[in-house]
Amino acid sequence: MATYKLLLLPGDGIGPEVMAEVKRLVGWLDAQGIAKFETEEGLVGGASYDADKVSITDATMAKALAADAVLFGAVGGPKWDSVPYEVRPEAGLLRLRKDLALYANLRPAICYPALAESSSLKPEVVEGLDIMIVRELTGGVYFGEPKTVTDLGNGQKRAVDTQVYDTYEIERIARVAFDLARKRRNKLTSMEKRNVMKTGVLWHEVVTQVHQREYKDVALQHQLADSGGMQLVRWPKQFDVIVTDNLFGDMLSDIAAMLTGSLGMLPSASLGDTDPKTEKRRALYEPVHGSAPDIAGQGLANPIAMLASFGMALRYSFDRGDLADKLDAAIAAVLAKGLRTADLKSEGATVVSTSQMGEAIVKELEALHA
């Protein structure tokens, strides 16, 4: 049986609490002989700053580079608002993404039947929703140069951000999206703004070329990103996999997040290239939610997004889709029984703590393996 090297970076706020439930799950899988893990733990964010005056140490970064997958909790909080900008807690996550060369961000939006009433949309619109947004993570307007603010000398200033994409950046993110679509419902929607942006013209052109060369079996649709946002709210189940750039991906994935009813439910994966020597893809997995310092240490945090992020690691880093499917089923079963953390509480539901939710999911997984 293969041994998977896993680096756990709990971070700040509720990060350690939700990561504790991953440790519980990993321990159970190990004890049952279902999967074998070699786990290490490190500091990141404010916790790292408090200990070492940096948001992530070189030693922890070396562990991340050596791991098969990195599991990340959350960083930040008011405690560190006044620390120097270059060592702010969030800089630790940015360095991880940069040094691991993670360019593909995967954000699933799944609405479990038991939570359809929690969405702001009608239950029939979101029940059974299962879409994947693939966001390009290292290019575009967030990283393009020049990026300046110029004083024009007449009481006016001019701010400039630059949207830049090269062909190879679009090709590689398109391949990730097409490969995912092939394993799902064989449908990909590419979103850009080719009607007003030259990068949108190139994006449309390159995605079309990749489709024609390599993925003719996948149904490809092009859509303007603003229209896509509208359609996500109007009838989200029309989509399967959506691929888009950094800026639009940031916006569209947040729109999709709220279709599900709670940020506490949503995992994410950030993937790099596959090493041709080891055939391993560098990857970082994290919940979409933040550090929520206002509820930290109270047992109120929802661990499902963190556990589902580990599920994505099982699927994309460890090639254990069988286990990932069972974990998803266990989460759905627990929710169907009416167990809810505080963020999901509703009439008739049983409100449970962070650890009680994690324990219930592991017990359900145990029943599925019986």
Swiss-Prot record:
Name what cofactor the protein needs.
Mg(2+); Mn(2+)
Q: Which reaction does it catalyse?
A: (2R,3S)-3-isopropylmalate + NAD(+) = 4-methyl-2-oxopentanoate + CO2 + NADH
Q: Which Pfam families match?
A: Iso_dh
**Cellular compartments per GO CC:** cytosol
Where is this chain's protein located in or outside the cell? Cytoplasm
Family that this chain belongs to: Belongs to the isocitrate and isopropylmalate dehydrogenases family. LeuB type 1 subfamily.
Subunit structure as annotated in this protein's UniProt entry: Homodimer.
Cross-referenced PANTHER family: 3-ISOPROPYLMALATE DEHYDROGENASE
Q: What is this protein called?
A: 3-isopropylmalate dehydrogenase
Organism, by scientific name, is Nitrobacter winogradskyi (strain ATCC 25391 / DSM 10237 / CIP 104748 / NCIMB 11846 / Nb-255)
